[in-house]
Design a protein with these regions (language model features):
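Hydrophobic alpha-helical connector segments
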Residues: 76-120, 137-146
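Hydrophobic alpha-helical bundle segments that form small-molecule/ligand-binding pockets
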Residues: 122-177, 202, 221-224
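Basic, helix-initiating cap at the start of DNA-binding domains
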Residues: 1-41, 58-65
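Residues within the alpha-helical elements of helix-turn-helix
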Residues: 45
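Amphipathic alpha-helical segments used for helix-helix packing
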Residues: 68, 96-125, 155-163, 192-195
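Short hydrophobic/aromatic patch on the recognition helix
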Residues: 48-57
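Alpha-helical structural segments
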Residues: 20-27, 62-77, 90-94, 121-125
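N-terminal intrinsically disordered/low-complexity leader segments
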Residues: 1-16, 184, 188-199, 229-230
């Protein structure tokens, strides 16, 4: 029986339910990452004994599942997308925005499928946009391909943000600090392609990089979904 199927127990003396437990866990994770979340710490935040929480969840892994499903409600589109491209674009962009609000989400993306009610609703909204467009295997590969892109991009962006927080150096501060070393290495002539990228390339922000890459991936998927001539 999953955590969503198991009935909740009556709450006493401090009011408790899964909604309160999940909200407290998300608050802890937002403040200090997943390492800040434990049944004991959540119980302390709620001024309740840890054993009471085990009446609602059986493990920290179940708690993580509930946290992810709560955030899936933020990812769920407000209205049904008009077509497959919009559906995948909305999924990618809303997942990125959720991860920017909840950095810990990046650590839980890409594993087993989300089985909570909100996660299933997100999957349904995405897949239904392909209705009648292609066979189910093609649709699944399309969704997997775009998901692989945006999950990887989100994790990379999250890693950069964590590095900034840990070191106190922005991206440009870090580049300036390492500039002399990079300049001396490129001056050896051993890295001509890298030198061209460093000196001639255009530096873009994370949002632009994400959006551009997403459009390129969607363009590639479109070639596989194109209907053959009648």
């Amino acid at each position: 029986m999953t955590v969503w199927d198991r009935p909740e127990t009556p709450s006493r003396p401090v009011p408790l339910d899964r909604e309160r437990i999940v909200a407290a866990a998300i608050a802890l994770a937002d403040e200090g990452g997943l390492e800040a979340v434990s049944v004991r710490k959540v119980a302390a935040r709620l001024d309740a004994g840890p054993m009471r929480l085990y009446r609602y969840i059986s493990s920290k892994e179940e708690l993580f599942d509930l946290m992810v499903d709560e955030v899936q409600a933020e990812i769920l589109p407000e209205e049904q997308p008009g077509d497959w491209r919009e559906a995948l674009g909305v999924l990618a962009q809303r997942t990125r925005q959720a991860a920017l609000r909840h950095a810990w989400l990046a650590d839980l993306l890409g594993g087993r499928p989300a089985m909570g009610p909100n996660g299933l609703a997100v999957a349904e909204a995405t897949l239904s946009a392909f209705d009648g467009l292609a066979d189910v295997d093609t649709v699944m590969r399309a969704v997997e391909t775009v998901s692989a892109y945006f999950i990887g991009a989100i994790r990379r962006e999250t890693a950069h943000l964590r590095a900034e927080h840990a070191t106190g150096l922005s991206k440009h501060d870090w580049q300036r600090a390492h500039g002399p070393h990079m300049t001396s290495m490129l001056a050896t002539g051993r890295f001509p392609a890298l030198a061209k990228a460093v000196y001639d390339g255009t530096d873009v922000d994370a949002e632009t990089s994400f959006a551009t890459g997403l459009e390129w991936v969607l363009d590639g998927v479109a070639t596989k979904l194109a209907r053959p001539p009648a």
